[in-house]
């Protein structure tokens, strides 16, 4: 099992070595900006490296939105992110599910997701990540994910399970992996994060493993059950220990 972390994009290879990571995740630009990622001077070196690199798409992306001023730029920046990810030989691009304005728009939100994926041209796989909060989110509640997957599941999209988001959404971690696999047939990546807040809070505040509200045994069990590469999106201080903890507990 590959275990690693979300690191600074400045020098992912050096960061991986410093943290003892088998795999890393990076942003290719400002995650709060609509600006396209800039070409990287080290693109060839990253592409040639044996280290798997995942790319997290900008947080602003909302493919489900009815607002053209959000949805159209979302499609554009996802396309640009996928192209930039291909330039560095990335393993996949991870994108959040987004949301709609009210319950009456949820089914249309699913269809907007479908249109976005049908129009997307990418050499790199795209993974949908479950999210922590939002009353009208596409990927917070597992029952909503199931409805979304009925619409987009045959596009080849993958799935990234975030443990903190699952906890914050009020979904039980004890059988989360089994339930998601029953919906999607796959888990391609795990974001293994503790949570600073109580279950069902809707708050996306990560904590280092063992320092938050989630029983570390639950995190280990989820990672083992998923059987996918793992990224710790935790604070710099303590993240190396998070990797070592998971490696020891999973025998990886």
Swiss-Prot record:
Listed GO biological process terms: base-excision repair
Cofactor note: Binds 3 Zn(2+) ions.
Keywords assigned: DNA damage, DNA repair, Endonuclease, Hydrolase, Metal-binding, Nuclease, Zinc
Domain of life: Bacteria
Cofactor(s) for this UniProt protein: Zn(2+)
GO MF, one example: DNA binding
Enzyme Commission number(s) of this protein: 3.1.21.2
Catalysed transformations (reactions): Endonucleolytic cleavage to 5'-phosphooligonucleotide end-products
DNA repair listed as a keyword: yes
Residue sites binding Zn(2+) 1 per the record: 56, 96, 129
InterPro entries linked to this entry: AP_endonuc_2, AP_endonuc_F2_Zn_BS, Xyl_isomerase-like_sf, Xyl_isomerase-like_TIM-brl
Induction entry: Repressed by transcription regulator Mce2R.
Binding-site positions, Zn(2+) 3: 165, 204, 206
Residues that hold Zn(2+) 2 according to the record: 129, 162, 191, 233
PROSITE patterns named among the record's database cross-references: AP_NUCLEASE_F2_1, AP_NUCLEASE_F2_2, AP_NUCLEASE_F2_3, AP_NUCLEASE_F2_4
Uppermost EC category: hydrolase
Function: Endonuclease IV plays a role in DNA repair. It cleaves phosphodiester bonds at apurinic or apyrimidinic (AP) sites, generating a 3'-hydroxyl group and a 5'-terminal sugar phosphate.
Family: Belongs to the AP endonuclease 2 family.
Protein name: Probable endonuclease 4
Species this chain originates from: Mycobacterium tuberculosis (strain ATCC 25618 / H37Rv)
């Amino acid at each position: 099992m590959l275990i690693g972390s979300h690191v600074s994009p400045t020098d992912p290879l050096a960061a991986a070595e410093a943290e003892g990571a088998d795999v890393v995740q990076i942003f290719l630009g400002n995650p709060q900006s609509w600006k396209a990622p800039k070409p990287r001077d080290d693109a060839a070196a990253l592409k040639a490296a044996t280290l798997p690199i995942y790319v997290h798409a900008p947080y602003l992306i909302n493919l489900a939105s009815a607002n053209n001023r959000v949805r159209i730029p979302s499609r554009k920046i996802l396309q640009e992110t996928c192209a930039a990810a291909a330039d560095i030989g990335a393993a996949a691009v991870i994108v959040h599910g987004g949301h709609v304005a009210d319950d009456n728009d949820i089914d249309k939100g699913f269809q907007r997701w479908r249109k976005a994926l049908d129009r997307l041209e990418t050499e790199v796989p795209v993974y949908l990540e479950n999210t922590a909060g939002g009353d009208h989110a596409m990927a917070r509640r597992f029952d909503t994910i199931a409805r979304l997957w009925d619409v987009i599941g045959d596009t080849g999209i993958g799935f990234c399970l975030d443990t903190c988001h699952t906890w914050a959404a009020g979904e039980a971690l004890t059988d989360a992996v089994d339930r998601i696999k029953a919906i999607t047939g796959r888990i391609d990546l795990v974001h293994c994060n503790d949570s600073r807040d109580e279950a069902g809070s809707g708050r996306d505040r990560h904590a280092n493993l063992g320092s938050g509200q989630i029983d570390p045994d639950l995190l280990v069990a989820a990672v083992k059950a998923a059987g996918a590469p793992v990224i710790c999106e935790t604070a710099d201080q303590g993240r190396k220990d998070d990797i070592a903890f998971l490696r020891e507990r999973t025998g990886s």
